[in-house]
Amino acid sequence: MKDVVFIDTSIIVEYLLNGPKADFAEIVLSASSTNVTSTIVYRESLGALAMAFGREKFGIKGKHSLRKFIRKNGWAKFEPVVEALDGLIREGDIVVLQDFQGTSELKSIMKKYRLMPSDAQIALTCRNYSIEKIATFDSDFKRVDFLKTMGV
């Protein structure tokens, strides 16, 4: 059976923006493992990529400016961002899992591992699906004893 690796937001964004660690991200994404991610990672990635694209193309300075721009113009101008993310998921055969929804478990993970809610949600989803490996550049996941981190 193939290894299952959870792909975190940092790997996706680094790869699509061709950042300094994009080579490692490419190795992870092209490995023979079964790569999975979750809806929260999709959402985070879309937001980070839209921000980077908006800064470069439209001079957007921060989250508030991005929200204002989208409120006025919609998502049409960000279609290249959506297409890039969807293309990576499709071509990379990345399975998008539904996040585990349990507030008491979420709070427990947040407290035990000192994580922000989104990171705790990712860890909880990994635990719920029995995923032991996470590809990430976020060192906070090193504190999670049931996950083996790749990349940090």
List the predicted regions and their residue ranges.
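Helix-adjacent hinge/juxtasegments
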Residues: 55-83
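Active-site neighborhoods of divalent-metal-dependent phosphate/nucleic-acid chemistry enzymes
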Residues: 83-132
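Alpha-helix N-cap and coil->helix boundary residues
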Residues: 20-24, 40, 97-101, 117, ...
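Histidine- and aromatic-rich ligand-binding microenvironments
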Residues: 6-8, 14, 37, 98, ...
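Acidic, PIN/NYN-like endoribonuclease modules and their adjacent C-terminal/linker elements
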Residues: 2-4, 123-152
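Structured helix-beta-strand junction loops
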Residues: 31-32, 91, 144
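Alpha-helix capping/helix-boundary segments
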Residues: 11-12, 41, 102, 121-122, ...
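Short, well-structured N-terminal submotif of metal-dependent ribonuclease cores
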Residues: 1-64
